[in-house]
Amino acid sequence: MKVYEGNLVSKNIKIGIVAARFNEFIVSKLLGGALDALKRHDVADDDVEIAWVPGAFEIPLIAEKMAESKKYDAVICLGAVIRGSTSHYDYVCNEVTKGIATVSLKSGIPVMFGVLTTDNLEQAIERAGSKVGNKGFDAAVGAIEMVNVIRQLGN
C-alpha cells in the first residue's frame, strides 16, 4: 500500500497571499501569522507575494488570477467576515467559500481558506492569534503540506 502524506519541507515553494482590507485589524494579524509560519518553515521572503483586496468578496477573483499566473505553488486567502444585523454576512460567507473552493478545483493548486467567518469580533480576535491560535498560521502550514502532497502525487 502506498500512502501519500504531506510534509513541511518548503524547498522552492512560491506562495501568493490574498488579504482583504475590510476588518484589517483582524486580517493583519492573520497575515502576520501566515508570514510567521512561512518564515518558520524556511519559505524565503522573495518567494511570497501579497495582494490586498477591498473585502472578502473580492478574494476569489484575485486568488484565481494568482492561480492562473502559474507563478505560485499555493495561494493563501485571508479575510474576516463578522456577522452584523443583516443577511449580508450569509451571502458573503457563502460566496467567498464557494469561490475559493472553485478556484482550487479549477486551477489544481492549493487555495487555502484562511477567511474567518465569526458571529462577533471577540471570536475573530480569538482566531487571529489569541485563545484559538492563528488561522493565518494554520492556512500557511496547510499550504506547505498540500504542495508536498501534490508533488508526491506527481501532478
Swiss-Prot record:
<feature type="active site" description="Proton donor">
    <location>
        <position position="88"/>
    </location>
</feature>
<feature type="binding site">
    <location>
        <begin position="85"/>
        <end position="86"/>
    </location>
    <ligand>
        <name>(2S)-2-hydroxy-3-oxobutyl phosphate</name>
    </ligand>
</feature>
<dbReference type="Pfam" id="PF00885">
    <property type="entry name" value="DMRL_synthase"/>
</dbReference>
<feature type="binding site">
    <location>
        <position position="22"/>
    </location>
    <ligand>
        <name>5-amino-6-(D-ribitylamino)uracil</name>
    </ligand>
</feature>
<feature type="binding site">
    <location>
        <position position="127"/>
    </location>
    <ligand>
        <name>(2S)-2-hydroxy-3-oxobutyl phosphate</name>
    </ligand>
</feature>
<comment type="function">
    <text>Catalyzes the formation of 6,7-dimethyl-8-ribityllumazine by condensation of 5-amino-6-(D-ribitylamino)uracil with 3,4-dihydroxy-2-butanone 4-phosphate. This is the penultimate step in the biosynthesis of riboflavin.</text>
</comment>
<protein>
    <recommendedName>
        <fullName>6,7-dimethyl-8-ribityllumazine synthase</fullName>
        <ecNumber>2.5.1.78</ecNumber>
    </recommendedName>
</protein>
<comment type="similarity">
    <text>Belongs to the DMRL synthase family.</text>
</comment>
<dbReference type="GO" id="GO:0009231">
    <property type="term" value="P:riboflavin biosynthetic process"/>
</dbReference>
<feature type="binding site">
    <location>
        <begin position="56"/>
        <end position="58"/>
    </location>
    <ligand>
        <name>5-amino-6-(D-ribitylamino)uracil</name>
    </ligand>
</feature>
<feature type="binding site">
    <location>
        <begin position="80"/>
        <end position="82"/>
    </location>
    <ligand>
        <name>5-amino-6-(D-ribitylamino)uracil</name>
    </ligand>
</feature>
<dbReference type="InterPro" id="IPR034964">
    <property type="entry name" value="LS"/>
</dbReference>
<keyword id="KW-0686">Riboflavin biosynthesis</keyword>
<feature type="binding site">
    <location>
        <position position="113"/>
    </location>
    <ligand>
        <name>5-amino-6-(D-ribitylamino)uracil</name>
    </ligand>
</feature>
<dbReference type="InterPro" id="IPR036467">
    <property type="entry name" value="LS/RS_sf"/>
</dbReference>
<dbReference type="GO" id="GO:0005829">
    <property type="term" value="C:cytosol"/>
</dbReference>
<dbReference type="GO" id="GO:0009349">
    <property type="term" value="C:riboflavin synthase complex"/>
</dbReference>
<comment type="pathway">
    <text>Cofactor biosynthesis; riboflavin biosynthesis; riboflavin from 2-hydroxy-3-oxobutyl phosphate and 5-amino-6-(D-ribitylamino)uracil: step 1/2.</text>
</comment>
<keyword id="KW-0808">Transferase</keyword>
<dbReference type="InterPro" id="IPR002180">
    <property type="entry name" value="LS/RS"/>
</dbReference>
<dbReference type="GO" id="GO:0000906">
    <property type="term" value="F:6,7-dimethyl-8-ribityllumazine synthase activity"/>
</dbReference>
